[in-house]
Each structure stands twice: as C-alpha cells, then as structure tokens.
C-alpha cells in the first residue's frame, strides 16, 4: 500500500515510534499572554517574564513572550496573537492564570500532534474543579490564522483535533473582583448548560455551589445562575449565544442583571 503524508502526520503506521533526533536542539514555542482588563494582569505578566528568564538560564533557550491586551472578542484576540508569533505553534496563557513553576514550556508534541489543539488542566479556586477551563493552551499557528469559524468555545471549536492533557498547568485566579468572577462563571456555565453529558452537569453543579470561603463566591454563583437561564432561553439562537465571547456585551449584561 502507498505511504501518504497524512499517514505520517497522523501516526497511522503500525509498530513505528516517532523520536526526535538525539542531540538536536529545537526552538521553544512563542508564549502569548492574553488579557482583557484583568486587574492583576500586569502582576501575572511580570511573574511569567521571570519564569521565561529562568528558562533561558537553565535550558539556554528563551521563548518569545508577547503580551496581547484588550482586543475585543475572543476569536479576534487569538487571531491577532497568531499573527504576532513566529513559531509554528504558540502557547496561550490567560490574564488571570497563575502558572505553576513546574509547568513545562519546553514541551514539544510529536509530529502527528502538531496540528492538534492542546489544553492543560487548571485549578479553579471558586469551586475546586480541575479541568481545562482556564488552563494553558497550545495552538497550531497556521490553523488559528486560517480560521473563519470557531463555535461557542474557541478552544474546542477551532478543530476536531483536540487533546486534553490531564496535568495541572496553573491556578485560574479570575475571582479578583465582582465583575471578573461573574463574567468567568457566566461564560463557562452557558457552555456547560448547553451540554447534555454527566460530566458537564457535575461541573455546572459545582459552579452553582461555590466554595464557601472563596473570594467573590456570590458573584460567581450569580453568574452561573444567570448563565443557566440565558442558555435555556437562547439554546436555539446561535447568534445570541455567541455574545458570551463579546466582552462589551458581557459588561452590559452584567450591569443590567446585577445593579
């Protein structure tokens, strides 16, 4: 049978293990720090800068670190980021992510995973959940540049080739003020409400019942409750649902429902 490029890229050849050439040095992927008015974004970026400097000292390789701030729309922000990087894949760290010192930014996917969106876990301080929400992500650059559709969730909607990596990458510290806590809960819980699987329902229940000692827990709870109602009312209206990726719309929605 004929051997195709797709066979190589998708690892469809039996009994073959892909390895990188021993002794070869690969450039690290660019890191995008993506923020939108997070109160402690500058503090988080400074910490990430320090981490990158430490990487350069230890591994003699230093990834480019780029701060993309206050771009309207989730999709627009990621596409803008993709046009700023020079590596064939790029990391995305959210503005409210507190990245663990142990997280490995030198990670290199196998050749058949270079067109796959990777997502690492995050620890959610509002509800104690550990899953991909708020986690560090790795995107194929050209895929993001070429994207014209992406669905309600940019990360999972960008491509059918998606890889969830069950390793903790960061703490997602979005609950720094009332609006940020509400916004994060509202966006995520709209998505969870539209899913019908057991795991999504369990996660939604956790958002609706936050940890009693979590900062701004009442605001996050309100966001979750309002998200459930919003998703139920608009479940058949994709255009309205997409507003959860519009930060200007979210601010107006928050002020209407919570003031």
Question: Where in the sequence are the language-model features?
Answer:
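Catalytic-site signature of metal-activated, phosphate-bearing donor transferases
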Residues: 1-22, 107-259
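Acidic donor-binding/catalytic loop of UDP-sugar-dependent glycosyltransferases
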Residues: 95-112
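Short, solvent-exposed loop/turn segments at secondary-structure junctions
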Residues: 38-39, 72-73, 96-98, 124-125, ...
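A general structural motif
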Residues: 26-28, 87-88, 114-115
